């Protein structure tokens, strides 16, 4: 085996960053541990996905105390925090207690022609000089750091929110989660307000504006508050669930408060703005919220086929034009035909009788279709004429009475 690179971590710096790690460790189980800037000052980062449109990065600037790398290796090296088929978590062991030394070594097989590492070994030595932990896993493919992409973008505005404002904003966002899956963030330079819109609901947050460069403003804070540096008006559409999680991740009591950075291209970064009383300034947490404006177009496209389906011409005509009197008059005619068929049909009738009944049933319909105008000029039937349709019901009622009387007589 040939060693390609080795990194020795500082247990003291990791111990001082334990409070931030405990705050975000639930989001880092399926993360990637990455070592970047190998030619200058190596930086250790723990990167993980957050929901469907967010990325969490827990970065430690001075975590690497010593390094040895080959000149051919210039790209970042990364491996999984949680190895396949096991319960070992590298980050949990790195931020443990009573640790004396941590060594991360990348190596490869001597038979392979490639100079890139294939495996990684973590070796942790504890203070008792007896206990030692070793774990070996494979190296994942190259993953470009998020910072390199953000460095190419232009920072339009940076906004700091106090812990009280963040708590109220989180509560308001949770109450309106069912209104829309996305949230629209808009900063107005003239009015110095942040407008958050979810569906038909919106809330406004006022802040104090400073004439500063947003990229380098508010690195450390004496006291948290609502203030910012804005160059131009900016708008971004982000995932609502990711926004709620991002505010909670970057809000660590007595350590840091959320800072909103608006980049060109509709990207919003919620990072941790450290307070001066913080004891871990080298550890930073940031969440990148990707542009979610396309998610608004997809539901609209799915609803178009259902709303734009052409209706039947008959139904459209019935809605546009008033219904003629023909259906209202034809109802009693159709009621008279079925009783005749019922009376004539019996188990003793022959096939010829049934044919005659079928022909008689069709006669009212044909005569009605040929002369529909005979029924239109007639006024509503008086009560005397209405009784003409009731003789058929009389024998039914008499039969019921006779049956009931006979039944009583038998008893």
From Swiss-Prot:
It holds the Pfam family Herpes_DNAp_acc. Keywords: DNA replication. Increases the processivity of the viral polymerase, probably by acting as a sliding clamp that prevents dissociation of the polymerase from the active template. It comes from Alcelaphine herpesvirus 1 (strain C500) (AlHV-1). The lineage of its organism: Viruses, Duplodnaviria, Heunggongvirae, Peploviricota, Herviviricetes. The keyword rRNA processing does not apply. The keyword ATP-binding does not apply. This is DNA polymerase processivity factor. Residues 345-358 have a biased composition (Acidic residues). Residues 296-411 are annotated as: Disordered. Belongs to the herpesviridae DNA polymerase accessory subunit family. GO terms for biological process: DNA replication. Residues 304-318 have a biased composition (Low complexity).
């Amino acid at each position: 085996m040939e060693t390609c690179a080795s990194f020795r971590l500082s247990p003291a710096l990791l111990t001082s960053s334990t409070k931030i790690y405990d705050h975000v460790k639930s989001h880092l189980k399926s993360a990637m541990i990455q070592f970047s800037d190998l030619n200058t000052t190596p930086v250790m980062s723990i990167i993980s996905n957050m929901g469907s449109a967010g990325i969490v990065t827990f970065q430690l600037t001075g975590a690497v105390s010593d390094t040895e790398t080959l000149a051919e290796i210039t790209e970042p090296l990364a491996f999984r925090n949680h190895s396949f088929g096991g319960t070992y978590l590298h980050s949990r062991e790195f931020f443990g207690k009573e640790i004396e030394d941590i060594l991360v070594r990348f190596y490869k097989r001597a038979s392979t022609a490639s100079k890139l590492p294939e495996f990684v070994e973590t070796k942790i030595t504890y203070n008792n000089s007896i206990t030692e932990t070793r774990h070996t896993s494979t190296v994942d493919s190259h993953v470009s750091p998020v910072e390199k992409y953000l460095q190419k973008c232009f920072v339009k505005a940076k906004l700091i929110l106090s812990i009280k404002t963040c708590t109220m904003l989180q509560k308001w966002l949770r109450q309106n989660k069912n209104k829309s899956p996305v949230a629209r963030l808009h900063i107005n330079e003239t009015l110095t307000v942040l407008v958050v819109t979810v569906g038909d609901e919106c809330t406004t947050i006022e802040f104090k504006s400073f004439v500063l460069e947003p990229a380098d403003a508010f690195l450390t804070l004496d006291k948290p508050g609502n203030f910012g540096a804005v160059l131009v008006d900016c708008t971004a559409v982000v995932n609502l669930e990711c926004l709620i999680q991002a505010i909670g991740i970057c809000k660590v009591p007595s350590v840091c408060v959320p800072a909103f950075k608006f980049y060109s291209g509709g990207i919003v970064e919620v990072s941790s703005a450290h307070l001066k009383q913080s004891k871990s300034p080298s550890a930073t947490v940031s969440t990148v919220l990707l542009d979610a404006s396309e998610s608004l177009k997809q539901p609209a496209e799915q609803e178009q086929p259902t709303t734009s389906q052409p209706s039947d011409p008959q139904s459209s005509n019935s809605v546009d034009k008033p219904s003629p009197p023909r259906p209202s008059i034809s109802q009693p005619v159709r009621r008279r035909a079925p009783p005749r068929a019922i009376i004539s049909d019996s188990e003793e009738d022959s096939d010829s009788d049934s044919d005659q009944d079928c022909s008689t049933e069709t006669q009212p319909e044909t005569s009605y279709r040929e002369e529909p105008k005979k029924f239109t000029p007639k006024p509503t039937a008086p009560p005397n004429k209405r009784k003409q349709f009731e003789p058929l019901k009389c024998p039914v009622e008499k039969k019921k009475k006779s049956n009931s009387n006979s039944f009583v007589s038998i008893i």
